[in-house]
């Protein structure tokens, strides 16, 4: 299956199937205001997936907001894993990460490395990231065992 076939992907099924993969993730990217957040929340609700809005979570926690200029990939990993534990779900959708990109100086290499290494210590969880499109994401080659890209353009996802 090639990237040209991504137009037929049902994201809920894709995320569930990713549980068996070496990298149990999907990165969905699209233009600003394309409806990614609404889609992610609805997908989570309809499928009993966890949903983490990182911007809201950081904004609502004084101990995190005070470190926003130093909020690095390790801090994000810690936040995601603690939220995944609390959510008690097999799939966690992670949204509104884009506010952190300026903190990371526009370099998503450390983010990509974190995604590759993101594992819950106690259970198999698939992580779905929703991000704004940027060149480093469009060029990222992260494939699953079936040679299907785990980096998916939002416009190629089948609607709910």
Task: List each language-model region with its residue ranges.
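Short loop/turn segments at strand-loop or loop-helix junctions that form parts
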Residues: 54-58, 90-98, 131-133
């Amino acid at each position: 299956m090639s990237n040209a076939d991504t137009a037929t992907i049902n994201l809920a099924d894709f995320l569930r199937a990713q549980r068996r993969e070496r990298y149990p993730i999907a990165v969905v990217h699209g233009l600003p205001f394309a409806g990614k957040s609404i889609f992610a929340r609805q997908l989570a609700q309809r499928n009993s997936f966890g949903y983490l809005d990182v911007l809201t979570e950081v904004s609502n926690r004084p101990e995190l907001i005070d470190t926003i200029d130093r909020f690095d990939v390790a801090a994000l990993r810690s936040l995601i894993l603690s939220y995944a534990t609390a959510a008690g779900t097999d799939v966690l959708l992670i949204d509104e990460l884009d506010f952190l990109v300026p903190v990371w100086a526009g370099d998503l290499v450390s983010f990509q490395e974190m995604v590759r290494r993101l594992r819950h210590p106690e259970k198999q969880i698939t992580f779905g990231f929703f991000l704004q499109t940027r060149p480093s994401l469009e060029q990222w080659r992260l494939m699953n065992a079936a040679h299907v890209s785990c980096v998916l353009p939002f416009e190629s996802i089948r609607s709910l």
